C-alpha cells in the first residue's frame, strides 16, 4: 500500500453534544428559570383570592365580638399598632362612632395543654369586655376544645367583665380560687384563656389614653 492510498488514522469516538457539561448546565439553568416563572405566575394568580378570603375571615371574626351598633367606620381600615413592653407589637382595630372611639379589638396568644391559643377580644371604651373568641388552638378534642364557641358557650362568660369585675383574685378558674369555670378533665386550657383575656384587659388599661385618642383625619 502506497502513501497515497494509506488508510486514515483511526478517529476517537464521537462526543454526544447532549453529554457536554456546558449544555447540561444551560439546560438546567433554563429549566430552573421556567420553573421560577411558573411559580411566580401561580403566586400572583392566588395572592388576590387569598387576601380577599383573609379579609372576609377577619370581618367575620370582628363581627362576633364587636357589636355593629358601636361603630360607623370600618375597623379593619382604622388600625393602631401598640408597642408594649410585655406583649410586643399588637395590632389594634379601632371602632368609632361619630368620630369618637367606642371600642378596640385585638388578638393575643396564650399557651394551653396542646400549644398556642389565639384569642380575639373586643374592649369597650369604659374597659368592659364586649366579646371574646378563640381563633385557633390545638387543644384536646372533647375536652379542651370547649373554648370554641361552636362547642360550648363558656367563652361568652367573659362579656361584661373588666379588671374590677371580678377583682385581681377572681381572674382565675374556680379550681385556683377564681370565678371562671374549668372543664371536667381539662383545667390547663381554660386557665390559659382566662389568663390571656386578663392580659388583654391589662394591656388596654396600660394604653387607654393612646387607644381612645381620636383617629387622625383622613386626607
From Swiss-Prot:
This is Ion-translocating oxidoreductase complex subunit G. Its EC number is 7.-.-.-. It holds the Pfam family FMN_bind. The modification FMN phosphoryl threonine is found at residue 187. Its cofactor is FMN. It comes from the Bacteria. GO terms for molecular function: electron transfer activity; FMN binding. Belongs to the RnfG family. GO terms for biological process: electron transport chain; nitrogen fixation. The keyword Nucleotide-binding does not apply. The keyword Membrane applies. Part of a membrane-bound complex that couples electron transfer with translocation of ions across the membrane. It is a single-pass membrane protein. It comes from Cereibacter sphaeroides (strain ATCC 17029 / ATH 2.4.9). Keywords: Electron transport, Flavoprotein, FMN, Membrane, Nitrogen fixation, Phosphoprotein, Translocase, Transmembrane, Transmembrane helix, Transport. The complex is composed of six subunits: RnfA, RnfB, RnfC, RnfD, RnfE and RnfG. One of its GO terms (cellular component) is plasma membrane-derived chromatophore membrane. Its main location: membrane. The chain crosses the membrane at residues 25-45. It is found in: Cellular chromatophore membrane.
Amino acid at each position: 500500500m502506497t502513501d497515497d492510498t494509506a488508510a486514515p488514522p483511526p478517529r476517537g469516538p464521537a462526543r454526544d453534544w447532549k453529554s457536554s457539561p456546558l449544555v447540561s448546565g444551560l439546560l438546567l439553568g433554563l429549566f430552573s428559570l421556567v420553573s421560577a416563572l411558573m411559580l411566580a405566575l401561580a403566586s400572583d394568580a392566588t395572592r388576590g383570592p387569598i387576601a380577599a378570603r383573609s379579609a372576609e375571615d377577619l370581618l367575620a371574626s370582628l363581627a362576633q365580638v364587636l357589636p355593629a351598633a358601636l361603630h360607623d367606620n370600618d375597623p379593619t381600615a382604622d388600625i393602631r399598632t401598640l408597642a408594649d413592653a410585655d406583649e410586643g407589637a399588637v395590632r389594634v382595630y379601632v371602632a368609632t362612632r361619630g368620630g369618637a372611639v367606642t371600642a378596640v379589638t385585638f388578638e393575643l396568644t396564650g399557651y394551653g395543654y396542646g400549644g398556642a391559643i389565639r384569642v380575639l377580644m373586643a374592649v369597650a371604651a369604659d374597659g368592659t369586655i364586649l366579646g371574646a373568641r378563640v381563633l385557633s388552638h390545638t387543644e384536646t378534642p372533647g375536652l379542651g376544645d370547649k373554648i370554641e364557641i361552636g362547642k360550648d358557650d363558656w367563652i361568652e362568660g367573659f362579656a361584661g367583665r373588666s379588671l374590677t369585675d371580678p377583682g385581681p383574685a377572681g381572674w382565675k378558674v374556680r379550681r385556683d380560687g377564681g370565678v371562671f369555670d374549668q372543664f371536667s378533665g381539662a383545667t390547663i386550657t381554660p386557665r390559659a384563656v382566662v389568663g390571656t383575656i386578663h392580659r388583654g384587659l391589662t394591656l388596654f388599661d396600660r394604653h387607654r389614653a393612646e387607644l381612645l385618642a381620636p383617629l387622625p383625619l383622613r386626607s
